[in-house]
């Protein structure tokens, strides 16, 4: 019985905490999402350039003796 009370108390506290959360407005959410998408795109381009560069360097090094 005490265990059931602890579980109930836990979920009651979770419910109380969700009322304290300050949820972002739609405008803030869109802005944050846009920042993440742009950051991922830029990071992907950096990875692409690095991968392409390393590939070309390795091809150059492997073809030196041929």
UniProtKB/Swiss-Prot annotation:
Keywords: Cell inner membrane, Cell membrane, Membrane, Protein transport, Translocation, Transmembrane, Transmembrane helix, Transport. The keyword Cell inner membrane applies. The keyword Ligase does not apply. GO terms for cellular component: plasma membrane. Its main location: membrane. Essential subunit of the Sec protein translocation channel SecYEG. Clamps together the 2 halves of SecY. May contact the channel plug during translocation. NCBIfam families: secE_bact (TIGR00964). HAMAP family: SecE (MF_00422). This is Protein translocase subunit SecE. It comes from Rickettsia felis (strain ATCC VR-1525 / URRWXCal2) (Rickettsia azadi).
């Amino acid at each position: 019985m005490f265990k059931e009370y602890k579980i109930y108390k836990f979920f009651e506290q979770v419910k109380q905490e969700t009322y304290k959360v300050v949820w972002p407005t739609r405008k803030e959410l869109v802005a944050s999402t846009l920042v993440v998408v742009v950051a991922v795109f830029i990071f992907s381009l950096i990875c692409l350039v690095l991968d392409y560069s390393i590939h070309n360097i390795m091809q150059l090094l492997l073809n030196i003796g041929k």
